[in-house]
């Protein structure tokens, strides 16, 4: 049996970080070796005890690069591929991803908010370093299926709008998942929603954000929600609606573990779970 995959989790004490740590601890082929979080007063505490799992003998640290450096050195003379799973904040995810690649640690990025320019920069940087990684807007297999169905339907409908709904602590809008869905639809058709009336918004933004293709994207933020997305197509006499609901974050864990297991064999960054399944 091969050695377990060393895994560092950034955003370890957050809701997604906690789910990831629980999944990693219970996966026989993974080993939690680092827990990064900047929550005040938690430095040096055992992450397992903080999350109510069990004592894991992995201390919480706020030193991101120090943790990556230590993990990188620990696997330098082995055939192991260390992995960083990042669920932090859009403001730091670019720097985190670039640092992981620089240290030879394979990034698995669940934090959304990277711009196309940043994503392109990271892809080129990872290719030069021959360090594989993955930026995954949504780890749900069900969402991948919705996106594929939306791309297929786009061939037949000229009118479509996308709505994503998340908890009110999500920092970015629209979600990376919603943007990715729109991008897949735009690969099939370059222009949507031909104008049939001269629209006027009495409240700016009422029609959502409009992409260059004409697709309208709407974002809702409310307590009680987890992650939900709807794509509605319209044509004379009918509508066609696709919807996916995540009701518990455990739905993401099969996709997270799949990505952890596959990034070590990649030679550059990939975007989207569909690239791995």
Swiss-Prot record:
| Pathway noted in the entry | Amino-acid biosynthesis; L-lysine biosynthesis via DAP pathway; (S)-tetrahydrodipicolinate from L-aspartate: step 4/4
The highest taxon in the source lineage is Bacteria
The reaction(s) catalysed by this protein are: (S)-2,3,4,5-tetrahydrodipicolinate + NAD(+) + H2O = (2S,4S)-4-hydroxy-2,3,4,5-tetrahydrodipicolinate + NADH + H(+); (S)-2,3,4,5-tetrahydrodipicolinate + NADP(+) + H2O = (2S,4S)-4-hydroxy-2,3,4,5-tetrahydrodipicolinate + NADPH + H(+)
Record: residues binding NAD(+): 11-16, 110-112
Residue positions binding (S)-2,3,4,5-tetrahydrodipicolinate: 167, 176-177
User: What is the active site of this protein?
Assistant: 166 (proton donor/acceptor), 170 (proton donor)
What GO terms are given for molecular function? 4-hydroxy-tetrahydrodipicolinate reductase; NAD binding; NADP binding; oxidoreductase activity, acting on CH or CH2 groups, NAD or NADP as acceptor
Quote the cellular component terms of the Gene Ontology held in the record. cytosol
Where found, per UniProt? Answer: Cytoplasm
EC number annotated for this UniProt entry: 1.17.1.8
InterPro entries in alphabetical order: DapB_C (IPR022663), DapB_N (IPR000846), DapB_N_CS (IPR022664), DHDPR_bac (IPR023940), NAD(P)-bd_dom_sf (IPR036291)
- Where is it mainly found? cytoplasm
**Alphabetical keyword list:** Amino-acid biosynthesis, Cytoplasm, Diaminopimelate biosynthesis, Lysine biosynthesis, NAD, NADP, Oxidoreductase
Tagged with keyword Oxidoreductase: yes
GO terms classed as biological process: diaminopimelate biosynthetic process; lysine biosynthetic process via diaminopimelate
Q: Which family does it belong to?
A: Belongs to the DapB family.
What job does the chain carry out? Catalyzes the conversion of 4-hydroxy-tetrahydrodipicolinate (HTPA) to tetrahydrodipicolinate.
Record-given protein name? 4-hydroxy-tetrahydrodipicolinate reductase
